[in-house]
Amino acid sequence: ECTIAGSGYQDIYWGELISALAASTHKINKIIGESWYNVEDYGIALAKAHGAGLTLEEFEKEVAASDNISDTDRQNIINSGNYQPSYMWNVNGWLVSKLGLTVISQTQKCIPETYQEDIHSDTLNMDIKKGMATGMSAVVTTLTKEGITLETKCVGKVYAKTEFDKNEWTIVGEPD
């Protein structure tokens, strides 16, 4: 007999690691998570979906506008099956379920990332001018019936020379 199992970055670093840390915590008030990735590593479709290379006005219309709606409108889009959440949207739901919590609300906000000087993108075959979107931060906030808030953010963008992939999580509570 043979068992083959597979897993990925989200499963380990956004899920199992956090639930293990939470299990060792006496009291949790808030879970804060942030993960960064370079859109240059994942191709043109991902770079464009993250708004890389757009002006801030274009970003607002093409990327952020879908999150600047009422909770009722968002729920209707979710119910229709047409909502396109960020990676963290599903992670928050998974963590809430894994921790035995109950969601009372969940929101997402896509915020453009910029840089103070021009950055070249090989993927987009362009120089992204200072102040244009290099990508985005998608911030997902989940409130639970039990009083625990999850605030997670995935940052996908064209990196400057000093930027790098990172995964940072904080559990606020006791111990802090």
Predicted regions: what they are:
Residues 1-7:
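Beta-strand-loop-alpha-helix segment that lines the small-molecule cofactor/substrate pocket
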Residues 21-172:
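Active-site-lining helix/loop region of Rossmann-like oxidoreductase modules
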Residues 8-15, 38:
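Gly/Ser/Thr-rich loops at beta-strand to alpha-helix junctions
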Residues 12-24:
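Alpha-helical support elements that line or immediately flank enzyme active sites
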